């Protein structure tokens, strides 16, 4: 590349870089100007804090700035990396001061300041000094000029109060000129009327010296103002218009000094001083100019009537009389050159044409009655006739203005007063009218509600609420019924002391019993339900309570429950009387409400189970005669279970107790005389300790399964069990010796066992007499829950084996009888002293050490239902043999009770300890996979792998010794792979003998040679 080409390229690149630099600089300057504009607005906000302490507080707590002075919604925030500006802050401050002074001289110096004599309540001079601290010179010059001109004598007030002609009048161009000179608009002169009224005597606030040159707009104005630089002038004009509307409306509504009854009392007469009539004469002397000013600020409304235009014009005049102009620009009056006819026409046009207003018309004016509208029209006609009667004068200038002012002073207050009276009367009439209308509406509603024949569109609001409450009460009643059932069962599971079971009664939910309400209510059923439940009587509560208490609880417990229910039912009488007034009407809509709780579902399930069991009771009545023996064992079983569960209220732990043969004999005679039904539940501990008789409630024998869950047990079985226990105590013969009394069952001494075993059928295969050696049958139930009796201490140690014969069992029984004769005092006391409450596990291997009683006597839950008919049949024929001779009965008494010789379970009887069991081999990872090779999918070999040359080469390599090619395999040296910085230190310890192939545990040379021969390497 030549030098010329490189030079051209360099020049192009230089020009391009310069263009980029210029573009970036322009963009940067624009961003800086935008950012500085945004920063100025925020600094103006911060400068509202006019004391140093406020600024220091903001510095210490910068979060307040975020809360109070957040970024305006429409202000653009530009983030850019700004270089250090070379412009000094002093020059910026100087420019701000110059711009502020120029702004006041150009636009805001036109503001006319009212003297203190006009309004003594507002300290306007203080606020003027507060807002215009840096421009006192220009504002004072304007004020002095106005006062000096107004105090000249012999001249009409209008000519005296004329402003200098060199000041520009109010127009949109002046606003543009004002705001285009400096982008930051300055605060207007007049504050809001509320601030003026609140601070009449405040001292001027001291501004911070650093911000004394800044005058700020309000924060609301900044938020409403769009921040675009191109539309700043238009937004400023619209902002001034909005501000004028708001200020005028605020003055009309909030200023306490202005009253509509006396609108123009403050208007001065022609002989008053010129300073006091400065602004009012200016407004009243040229209504056409005033209208032109308003039309330039606010768009005209043409839908207002003449009376509204009249009131609005008078209100505007009063508002301008009592405040400073919010726009900060005064309009100058011109020399009047028109004749009195033209002035009269302008007055007529002002009075009759629609006038622009700043405020919305109040509702009391727009809602005139016809009579008031007629009066208003008559008033306007009268005003028009008064205008025509005005004296016509040909004198131009001050005479015309004075006559026009006289007309306004004389006529307008009277008309405004009349209009105000009409407005007040119309407002009162409107309030009375609305009140009457509301009263009529209420009367119609009451008539409709009282007339029951009329069907309302919607049902009353109280009726669904009552339905929900009634449904909730019924659900609560079911909860109480279920809680009572659980309460009776908790008494069974309570501990030794009966006081604890009594404490459970006091924890019953205090909800009265109410008849159930489970079906969906309709018009008829809801009425019937309300009529039945609106007055809950104590008899209904008692009848429901008697169902659960009469047959299951002692008299003391019955009285306690009845008293508690009576106390609970008392506070409901008042509620029932109130609810009875709001019963469902026949015309009300059907309400489908049902409150379903978990307890309600549980209660329904319990009722379903009872219904099924009741159906089974009818079928079992036929076989009752053949089951008397079974009931004898079940009765004794229930007694044993009752005594045991008082000690240990566990869910699936049952007890083992000892019984004397005499007790069993007496029990058998008692049951044979009067058969009882099967007990379904466990009596409470408190009822067991009490000796009070219970009412006997005869029930049909059932085959209801006994569940371990106590909440599903019927409480009516308590009385039956306790009644039988009392009968046994009364019918016990007194001829027994003292040892017999010591052999009686004691409820306080029990023995706990774990879950029963599953080997009942196993021992039936060998000898059926072993299954019933204790004369106590096993409860056959799906939950495999039962209790067995402990006959003696010796039976714990000497248990029967499965493989023994009957002769060996008889020898053992004789030994047990001899031990009992030596130790007459035995039973639970002996068991407790020797073994304590030692838990005996039944689910052990039958061929291991015999460490539990009655091993394998109980069926599993899966086979219990299928074996139940056989067990009940066997219980009738099996002899009642115990482990001692005293418990055995002669065979002549029961010839049918013989041990069946047939083996019903041949599979279990053939088992012995020496039986060998063959198990399948365990699948191992080291097993041969030759069997699975056929099942594996064949691998698709590539074409090169199937070439005959490759196969020949592989066959030749099979005889090569890999040690000759690759060398001997050396042991792994961890230090070689993981080298440490310090060679002297060994990071890894040497391997042990079990894995150290480099030590003596290596292969011998003979083993190596043998391996090579087998592989064909040698």
UniProtKB/Swiss-Prot annotation:
Residues 189-199, 268-287, 329-339, 522-554, 645-664, 705-719, 784-808 have a biased composition (Polar residues). Residues 184-207, 247-287, 306-365, 522-556, 570-756, 781-813, 848-867, 877-944 are annotated as: Disordered. Residues 570-580, 624-644, 665-679, 692-702 have a biased composition (Basic and acidic residues). Pfam families: INCENP_ARK-bind (PF03941). One of its GO terms (cellular component) is nucleus. Residues 309-320, 890-902 have a biased composition (Low complexity). One of its GO terms (biological process) is regulation of mitotic cytokinesis. Keywords: Chromosome partition, Cytoplasm, Cytoskeleton, Nucleus, Phosphoprotein. InterPro entries: Inner_centromere_prot_ARK-bd. The modification Phosphoserine is found at residue 171. It is found in: Nucleus; Cytoplasm, Cytoskeleton, Spindle. Belongs to the INCENP family. Component of the chromosomal passenger complex (CPC), a complex that acts as a key regulator of mitosis. Has a role in sister chromatid cohesion and condensation. Component of the CPC complex at least composed of ark1, bir1 and pic1. This is Inner centromere protein pic1.
